[in-house]
Amino acid sequence: MKVIIDEQVHQAILEFYAISMRLHPTLDEETVLAKVERLIGAMYDLGKHPFIYADARLKKSWMAAEYKETIVEDFHIAYRVETDEDGEQYVAIYDAVHSKLYY
């Protein structure tokens, strides 16, 4: 199944790691890049098994929008399976928040 990641999700991930690198000098760019690649890869893998995850519980707005939620690399990912005009289903990822920023 095709996966579409909202631009704000990319921004949230990049901003989190940019700030993390400034706050933690021991966190190097190579490590961050590897984490981002694993995170993005896992989001695209949602297209293989989008229905196995539970309904979102982290944010009220996610619950109201009936998103599903998964956690990858300490990021909570909010997504929903949508249907396009041709009747094809796809995964739309709408939001992401790191556990350290939410709790």
Located regions from the model:
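Enriched for short, Lys/Arg-rich terminal
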Residues: 67-103
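Basic, Lys/Arg-enriched alpha-helical interface segments
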Residues: 1-67
